Regions:
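Short beta-strand scaffold positions
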Residues: 78, 124-125
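Short N-terminal targeting/anchoring amphipathic segment
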Residues: 4, 66-83, 94-96
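Carbohydrate-associated surface elements
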Residues: 128, 148
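A short, gly/pro- and small-residue-rich
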Residues: 87-103
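N-terminal subdomain of nucleotide-sugar transferases
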Residues: 1-48
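Short loop/helix-cap segments at secondary-structure boundaries that form the rim of catalytic
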Residues: 52-58, 68-72, 83-90, 131-137
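Conserved nucleotide-sugar phosphate-binding/catalytic loop shared by glycosyltransferases and other
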Residues: 3, 36-43, 54-71
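Membrane-proximal helix-turn-helix segments that form the acceptor-binding/catalytic region
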Residues: 100-122, 129
Length: 151
């Protein structure tokens, strides 16, 4: 499967920064998940604010600022931003939600139109996220993963 990760942090990183102080949980999850999916034989591309276009451990890291390839992926996973799906073509789209996605937040971050355009399933990290986020985020389905403890 050809899988793409999309992230638009305001700092540069790639998988060699896995133990860096600058990484937060979302970036660490992206690195670890991309490595494990690559180990399972999937073709992985990470489009983010990396230092330069390069291949590290069979994973393609591409600078988001200059990415314009419009490659088609089987699956695209965006790290908290639906507008990043505009950069690629994908058969399936998943939005990783690391925080509460309120309707107001979708509007404030100018993601409401891209959410309806791309219709991603949203990955929630806990029942708390599912129960305390806008119901609009479940229009196209959601997935709950057990990365933490609910209680």
């Amino acid at each position: 499967m050809n899988i793409c990760f999309l992230d638009n942090t305001n700092f540069e990183y790639n998988s060699q920064d896995i133990y860096s102080y600058k990484l937060r949980g979302a970036e660490t999850v992206l690195i670890n998940l991309s490595k494990e999916l690559s180990n399972l034989g999937h073709k992985i591309t990470v489009i983010n604010n990396c230092y330069k276009n390069e291949i590290i451990d069979d994973i393609s890291w591409k600078k988001i600022q200059s990415y314009d390839e419009k490659e088609t992926f089987d699956l695209a996973i965006s790290n908290g931003d639906t507008s990043l799906f505009d950069k690629i073509n994908s058969n399936k789209k998943i939005l990783f939600s690391h925080s509460l996605q309120t309707f107001e937040k979708f509007i404030r971050k100018k993601q409401i139109f891209s959410y309806f355009k791309h219709k991603p399933k949203i990955v929630f990290l806990s029942d708390y996220h599912i129960n305390n986020t806008s119901k609009i985020t479940s229009l196209f389905g959601h997935i709950r993963v057990n990365l933490g403890i609910d209680e």
